Amino acid sequence: MDGIFPSTDKMLYENVTIWREASGEYQTATTLSHYNHALPDSGSPCDEFRASLKKNGISSLLTTRGPVTCIKFQIPEDKVISLETLACLEGTIKVVGDYCYITVTTGDTVLEPPTPSQPAPTPEPAVKPQPIATRKRSGLSALLWPF
């Protein structure tokens, strides 16, 4: 099966769409889709996705922390949302209540943690060794255990 598609073509295995039914439940669908075009390099895929939502009258909230971006939105009952714009990114889709959360990892570099000015003190162990207790011999213990 390696020779079916040329190596320059791209395969999109999960073309995810998400919508909200009249009952209020969110539904998702995936398809196997073969495409030859490259995703546009202009702008952020998350910004393009949010612009698409805005164009369709759907408000969204974007939160970014380092390379992780979360987009929160609510889908009306009469809309179907395609996530094809975000296909080049790794991420998850979560539905909590009436809201859909899409968390994606972009290619941005992770912020490096600050370097401490002095080395941290070595932590003390949680369990400290105790000195071995000396056993006093009673007359009864000497009788039962003479050693």
From Swiss-Prot:
Name of the protein: Uncharacterized protein ORF36
Residue ranges, compositional bias (Pro residues): 113-128
Domain of life: Viruses
Region feature (Disordered): 110-133
